[in-house]
Amino acid sequence: MPRTAAVDADLRDPAAVLGNQDLRAVIDPGRPVCVILGAVVHFLDPQAACVVTAGYVSLMAPGSCLVLSCARFEDEELAKQLAEEYTAATWYNHSPADIVSFFDGLELAGPGVTEARTWPKWPPAADDRNGHVLAGVGRVPGT
């Protein structure tokens, strides 16, 4: 039996993603899983990002983890330029408080929601003047 599945669904629809029958054939939804939202929430407005992350968390078994990373620019002018240049999709420069809110109801691991490069074993940044990635790991409370 294959242990992988490709899911063709809208990321913004957690029920469609996690309810996909091909996925359920390889992942038991009653057991802890890890959902990784790497470098995607900055394409969702803050309200939608909260709804989407909460949707995934609501469908995850206790002990599951949500891993999330989000690009963040301190320089608002640079962020605006990036948003204007990025024409394939709308890009949002979420505030650190927005990003922390995506973990509401979860137990934060490690250093919490912080710059990804500050996590253990992260390679040193070549140039961090323009922006960075905020990241965190949250665990669904329970067993």
What is the meaning of each model-derived region?
Residues 1-143:
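Alpha-helical subdomain
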